[in-house]
């Protein structure tokens, strides 16, 4: 029977820190503009020129990954916490919780077969919008972009997830910084 990896992209999932420092999984708070584009859990985040955060794009400087949002619902006026932000949200107090520690390690699915020999290379992301009902990111590591030059992510290992750790097989999960 051939070894396969589950094809289940999930964006940049924080999994711990590099080295022996404290791993408190702390999140920083950043403002998000009303009626912003949809942002899903684990989407890569970047800072816009407005000082608000938005979904990261390929080749942009990434701030971290979204862990959730808080806002006062414009219709019900109730405080609301969610793992994502709908594009149609008109709240004026939206705050995003971002895993942004520079020592944070993330797990991300590769969009092709990543081999152990490619650990240490750099690559950008390839964006795909998240989906309902879970509102989790579908962003993946752009395998075709692997290089020694500067990029958004550096591959530092292959995941230990038993459903996605078969190196050299499509959809393997990589550990990145």
Predicted regions: what they are:
Residues 1-177:
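Surface-exposed, low-hydrophobicity beta-strand/loop segments enriched in small/polar/acidic residues
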């Amino acid at each position: 029977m051939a070894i396969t990896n589950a094809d289940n992209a999930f964006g940049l999932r924080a999994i711990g820190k590099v080295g022996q420092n404290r791993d408190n999984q702390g999140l920083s708070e950043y403002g998000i503009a009303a009626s912003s584009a949809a942002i899903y859990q684990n989407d890569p985040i970047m800072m816009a020129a407005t000082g608000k955060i938005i979904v990261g794009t390929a080749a942009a400087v990434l701030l971290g990954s979204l862990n959730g949002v808080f806002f006062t619902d414009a219709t019900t006026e109730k405080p609301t916490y969610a793992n994502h932000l709908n594009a149609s949200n008109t709240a004026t107090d939206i705050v995003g919780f971002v895993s942004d520690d520079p020592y944070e390690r993330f797990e991300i699915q590769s969009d092709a077969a990543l081999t152990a020999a490619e650990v240490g290379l750099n690559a950008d992301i390839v964006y795909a919008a998240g989906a309902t009902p879970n509102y989790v990111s579908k962003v993946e590591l752009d395998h075709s972009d692997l290089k020694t030059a500067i990029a958004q992510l550096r591959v530092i290992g292959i995941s230990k997830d038993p459903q996605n750790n078969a190196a050299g097989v499509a959809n393997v999960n990589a550990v990145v910084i």
